[in-house]
């Protein structure tokens, strides 16, 4: 009887161990390589009087534009901004196709005004970026949000959740 109990508990331990290990998520090698390539590309960006912007459109709910970082800096340092479009309209607004450029990457020319703007849907304050001009870098840039390469993170990201780049 003792031997059967031992075999039963041993089998249960093996099953639970395999079950728990199957729940561990590893990043596919292609995505990992894309992230390494993106980090190398960022490190190679020449310094200058410009910024890199990643359009982050969350439906018609939120009124921020996207993430902006300095050249050569990782996306984890980027700031979520509201655009001041008095001098230049945002790319999607110029085309009257709001949000059509979601997840696009741009070279932005302009500056931070030093002002913060209240965005009521998120109940947050965001820095104001005064856009002077822009250049499209990519319509399909490397992923910067966990939800772009993790099914588990994508499932956990709700419509009203604001992601932060990694």
Q: Where are each of the predicted segments found?
A:
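C-terminal motif of bacterial Sec signal peptides marking the signal peptidase cleavage site
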Residues: 20-23
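Bacterial N-terminal signal peptides that target proteins for export
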Residues: 2-12
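N-terminal hydrophobic targeting signals that begin at the initiator methionine
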Residues: 1-2, 25
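OB-fold and OB-like single-stranded nucleic-acid-recognition modules
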Residues: 26-166
């Amino acid at each position: 009887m003792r031997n059967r109990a031992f075999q039963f508990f041993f089998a249960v331990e093996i099953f639970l161990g395999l079950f728990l290990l199957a729940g561990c998520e590893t990043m596919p090698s292609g995505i990992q390589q894309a992230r390494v390539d993106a980090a190398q590309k960022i490190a190679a960006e020449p310094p200058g009087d410009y910024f890199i912007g990643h359009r982050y459109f969350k439906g018609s709910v939120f009124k921020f534009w996207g993430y902006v970082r300095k050249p050569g800096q990782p996306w984890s340092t980027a700031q979520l901004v509201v655009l001041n479009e008095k001098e230049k309209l945002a790319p999607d607004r110029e085309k009257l196709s709001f949000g059509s450029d979601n997840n696009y990457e741009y070279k932005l020319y302009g500056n931070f005004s030093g002002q913060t703007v209240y965005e009521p849907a998120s109940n947050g304050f965001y820095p104001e970026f005064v856009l002077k001009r822009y250049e499209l870098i990519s319509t399909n840039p490397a992923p910067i949000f966990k939800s772009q390469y993790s099914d588990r993170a994508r499932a956990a990201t709700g419509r009203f959740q604001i992601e932060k780049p990694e």
